[in-house]
Amino acid sequence: MASIPCTFQLSARASSASAAAAARRSPRAAARLGWLRPSRLSAVVPASESGRVGPTCFFKFGNKDAEGAGIYGSQGRDDFDRDDVEQYFNYMGMLAVEGTYDKMEALLNQDIHPVDILLMLAASEGDKPKLEELLRAGAKYDVKDVDGRTALDRAADDTREFILGFAATLAA
């Protein structure tokens, strides 16, 4: 998973009289906690410049979008593994419905790549954003499970049309 550098600036308005009183009551704590020190960031971009007071976060992606920055949609087939299958199985509530990991383990014990298993699970759930991500990563919708069913067989009609349409868009 990609990490994003982020800087937070918290500013609070206080009168100089109340800050001075706090410093007199506990000068060591005031110095240690930086109560009387202005933020180094506030000299560059004060929070009040935007017209609001509160946290401000600066993300530096340059000229890249989320995909180019490696956050979403930049994974390939081999970037998915068994742990991703288990996490998706749990996240989508399939364990709660099934009651056991048997269905997931049966798929993982076959000679099927984890990204293709994820595509089957996402197709059965109708999870279009996940389907899009997996198809971009190179998942194959014609891989068969132990019952001979593909992701298309598991999908509802609208999801099936989405898979075929999106795959055609990627092929073009």
UniProtKB/Swiss-Prot annotation:
GO BP: granum assembly; intracellular protein transport
Domain of life: Eukaryota
Residue pairs linked by disulfide bridges in the UniProt entry: none
Entry keyword annotation includes Nucleus: no
UniProt-annotated location(s): Plastid, Chloroplast
PROSITE patterns named in the record: ANK_REP_REGION (PS50297)
Keyword Protein transport belongs to the record: yes
Transit peptide feature range: 1-28
InterPro entries for the chain: Ankyrin_rpt-contain_sf (IPR036770), LTD-like (IPR044242)
One Gene Ontology cellular component: chloroplast envelope
ANK repeat residues: 114-146
Main location: plastid
Keyword field: ANK repeat, Chloroplast, Plastid, Protein transport, Transit peptide, Transport
Functional summary from the UniProt entry: Involved in the import of light-harvesting complex proteins (LHCP) and subsequent routing of these proteins to the chloroplast signal recognition particle (SRP) pathway.
PANTHER family referenced in this protein's UniProt entry, alphabetically: PROTEIN LHCP TRANSLOCATION DEFECT (PTHR47317:SF1)
Record-given protein name: Protein LHCP TRANSLOCATION DEFECT
Lineage start: Eukaryota, Viridiplantae, Streptophyta, Embryophyta, Tracheophyta
Gene expressing this chain: LTD
